[in-house]
Amino acid sequence: MVKKSKFWLPMIGIASAFALIPAVIVSCSRNNSTISQQYITTDIGGLNNTFNPTNTTGDNVNHKLVEKVKEIRQGGDQAKKDLLDQRVILITAGGKTNDKSFNQSVWEAVSKFSNEIGASDNTYYENSVIDQSTQSNSYDYAIAKKFKVWILTGFQQENFLIQWLSVGNNLKRFLNNKTFVITVDWFPADKSKIPAIQTILDSIKGRILGLNFKTQHGGFTMGYAASKLVQEIDADLKQDIPPNKWGTQERAFESGQTYFDAFGGGDFSGVTNFNYGFYEGLRQFNEENMNSSQQQNGKYFIKASPTDLTTNFAINNESKQKVFAQVDGHFVNGTQIPPKLIFPVAGSLTSVAIDRVKEKKSNQWIVGVDTDQSLAFEADKGILLTSVEKRIAIAAYKALLTVFGLTDYDTANQSEEKTNLLHGSGNTISDGLIMNGGSPVNFNSTGGYKEGFVGVSKSTLDPNLFKFKNKNKTYAERFDEIVAETWDKFFGKGDEEGLLQKKKNDNGGLFDENLFNQFNSATDRWSGYRNNAKTDPTKEQIDDVKPHILNLKNPFYGYMTFDDKWIYFDPIIDYINNFK
């Protein structure tokens, strides 16, 4: 039996110059870590994060919040003053804080919030090495320096934090410190089948607010919009091609059928949510633009290449060969056809895909993930169609407003309902704990397009290379227009419902989110068994997960590839079916 393990997605470290504000700055190094209070005014995350402490009248300052904080500090309510004085620390799990991506987005949120409430000593603790010892040192430092609000990025921190809490008197220290944790892109999974771990999680109930992202929304919009763009390019090219002798025209674009390709670093929802939405976008486009006979015969306008979920994020010879295979394309009737679009959900392997496209000079398009990757790949942005974004900075800023009890004072979002991440959940924050009906609870705030948690970046395709022949417009300009149209059509404009909410197709809606969430719950429980045990799941654990996954197989990834196979969560399903 092949041993499987859950691999993590390392952040892409890109050196950039921080824009510093006049403040007390402390920076030091500890072995593989850097500790700093250098606030930044960059705007990777779309927060309009510019701030001058000597001028609080700028357009991007949350004036209502600044005035409220001043009122609290001058007033007599000590409890509110104490709340404002909670110190925040960002602890990373790999990568630099100035990565022009994930970590930097979070630190932008902390910087903006800190500046607006007048906090000068909030801190980041970045770790260049991902292991238990390094992360434990981070948590020890946070306790020793009395940081009460911890922001932990990187899903691998779930296991690091639980392991640290299980050692010595760390749990007692954590509780005595009145620690509150904001988890970014992860949330502790149910560990009821592992009692020792569940006991620890029960001990810290009320102290965890998770930030997670419905990346399937962005994947859907990107997939649908890219398909429509190809359709319009084809129509544009056809204007210069006369009909054949039968009086018809074949497809002009790419000399025939077009293929899109996605690959991933692992078989868990942090990866496959992107894929799921992407394939649903392709499926929806094809269903709208093809008759039933064409669909039954697999003559889709856009087809998908097989999806490899085993690239494992790390750059090495094996993973490079897998990426090369995806970029180079698959054989159809003896002819190798490269995909027009490549969607890597595999961390640093995006750079490998970009380099391969450049080497082949193939004019293929790359789609990034997590943040606007054109900022990290400035020199190569001309082949980036877009990025499916987690709006991490916006989510983190809202989380801080929620934890500090300041959600009424976010002028950017205008309403408490849009800012308070606990709104509508029945939960409140009282004395530093999330409470529901008098009991402490941890809460996972999972947002999609409507909540401002996900998006699709502006296209940066080279305007000289990629433009329409018969109309004065670049592919990038038209793609951005289609994206806006797609959001409105499927997700709704303003308070209107979109088609995804109206559930108009036969199998319960373009997104049956309830079914989708059940599947993710099962697969993540499966992934948790593997990761926590550091070995293959037991027969009992397989039996626990198997019915959930197999029962949900048919509705998941309902999209046919060019070789007439349906895309499912094959690595898990194959493993379960072949389990001995």
Identify the function of each model-found stretch.
Residues 1-12, 20-75:
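Intrinsically disordered, low-complexity repeat and linker tracts
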Residues 46, 51-53, 57-580:
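A residue-level marker of the well-folded mature domains of exported/periplasmic proteins
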